[in-house]
Amino acid sequence: MLALPLLGAREPTTGPLTTHPWVTACKDRDDRDKPGPAFQVYRNTYYVGTCGVSAILVTSPEGHLLIDSGTEAGAEVVLANIRALGFDPKDIKLLLGSHEHSDHIGGLLTIQEITRAPIVTSFEGLNVIASGQATKDDPRYGTLEPMRSLPESSYTIEPSPILRYNEPKAQFLLDKFGVWPIPTPGYSPAAMSWTWRDCEGDECLTIIYAANLLPVSRDDYKFTDNPRYVHEFLASLQRIADAPCDILLTPLPSASKMRDTLRAGSLNASYAYRCDSYTRFQRSLLIDRLLQEDPEWMKKNFPQGIK
């Protein structure tokens, strides 16, 4: 698989160093199924994932929503973390995913069996979740672990356990929970980011769970052979860069420097890693990848460079 450095040079954080339980238990780029403690991100938003892979719980009196599940094994950690916070997984009314790979949504059907909550995803994501197989236009197609699949009858009849985010029922649920989708294809064709407002008294913050935006692939894949996909990738980066972003969360905690920020203090502090820094770095990796693949293609398609 062609890969790029995950984070590059670290940006220094400032603030008082603290001993956060998650920092003590977990390392950067830790094992994807290693249990880590749940913690409150802000008001009604909680981190309930493993040490290596994120899962986010957003709570409300009317029910909760969960974004990502980790692997099938990781889903058991997620469920245990939800219970450890005092919440009942059966009160989860909506399931969302960041991108259609087994390390992030491989346990989503396991959690759905317990919660009976619908999964809201993109059109492409529905096909992957239902079949358990990545699509051929995924840059990592052929290298990904398969996931559990659903029999066709279970998602073509009502009530369907999987909804496309632009369906009326899905839009009703998203509006009810105050969460909005941001399509972000790039790392995978069906990648989705999610944003919501969370309030502590009169202070409301915008939280973004931004999909992975690394330009990685199988060895024989070239982004420069797929110019339309490159433009979609760049548009995804711009959507995240332009979005209000008080707190950044990512499917891989290390991608948003979560451990560094927690070690220094709070995820909503002024020194926290946010969407502008995140997308600037990911864009630089994409540019490097395109130049590595075909410098002449870059000159022809982006004569002024990629801003």
Segments predicted by a language model, with ranges:
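Bacterial Sec-dependent signal peptides at the C-terminal "C-region" and cleavage site
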Residues: 2-14
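Metallo-beta-lactamase
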Residues: 11, 15-17, 21-27, 34-35, 64, 71-73, 153-154, 160-162, ...
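Short, flexible loop segments at the rims of nucleotide/cofactor-binding pockets, characterized by
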Residues: 24, 45-47, 70, 95-98, ...
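Conserved beta-strand hairpin/beta-sheet module of binuclear metal-dependent hydrolase folds
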Residues: 31-85, 89, 193-215
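Divalent metal-coordination and catalytic microenvironments
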Residues: 44, 58, 68, 99, ...
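Active-site HxH/HxHxD metal-binding segment of metal-dependent hydrolases
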Residues: 45, 73-76, 83-171, 278-281, ...
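C-terminal regulatory/interaction regions
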Residues: 274-307
